[in-house]
């Protein structure tokens, strides 16, 4: 006889017997409708009106809830001068990253603002390396197709030396292989020419001059 056999009994009811090679006694765990059979296994007695086996769950199924994955990071910028500031980065799911900038102590006017490759500040802002550039492209403006991922353009300081800006960019995620967490944000001395100034440094740095202040991007509670 096969390991699993289905037998039909008298017309008043139908019995399904499941033969188990692992047990010599039936179990009483399912319900009172389970009966002992002449086989080593379980007998299921079915109602003659339905001739079917009904299974029910003790708990109603619950709808699937999808929670948006918000990620947030912060960088505190400091340098050798009185330039300092705080930058927050926020990303919803896999959408673009919103960067909120407030930096003080700057000369009025435009200043290059970039994400650099390393979060190393052992030698001040100089040890943060070049612009973050995973795709090995030349320097450009944030809206250009050809640009470094870390090219965030210019921020503008007012007459009080304070620069406030909101930047929305899709090349600086907070998760994944190109995550910017652990890298450094740097504010520069001069205006970034966005790769169009014709200077020998335009294709690499935008000829934005020295590095006034920098800070490492780190995750923070949402």
Swiss-Prot record:
Cysteine disulfide links: 125-214
Pfam families: Sod_Cu
Gene Ontology cellular component terms for the protein in this record: chloroplast
An annotated Gene Ontology molecular function: copper ion binding
GO BP, one annotated term: removal of superoxide radicals
Cofactor: Cu cation; Zn(2+)
Keywords recorded for this protein, A-Z: Antioxidant, Chloroplast, Copper, Disulfide bond, Metal-binding, Oxidoreductase, Plastid, Transit peptide, Zinc
Cofactor descriptive note: Binds 1 copper ion per subunit.
Reactions accelerated catalytically: 2 superoxide + 2 H(+) = H2O2 + O2
Binding positions for Cu cation per the UniProt entry: 114, 116, 131, 188
UniProt keyword Nucleotide-binding, yes or no: no
Enzyme Commission number, as recorded: 1.15.1.1
SUPFAM superfamilies in the cross-refs: Cu,Zn superoxide dismutase-like
CDD domains: Cu-Zn_Superoxide_Dismutase
Subcellular location: Plastid, Chloroplast
Family according to the record: Belongs to the Cu-Zn superoxide dismutase family.
Functional description taken from the UniProt entry: Destroys radicals which are normally produced within the cells and which are toxic to biological systems.
Record text on subunit structure and interactions: Homotetramer.
PANTHER family: SUPEROXIDE DISMUTASE CU-ZN -RELATED
Protein name per the record: Superoxide dismutase [Cu-Zn], chloroplastic
Organismal lineage: Eukaryota, Viridiplantae, Streptophyta, Embryophyta, Tracheophyta
Gene (name only): SODCP
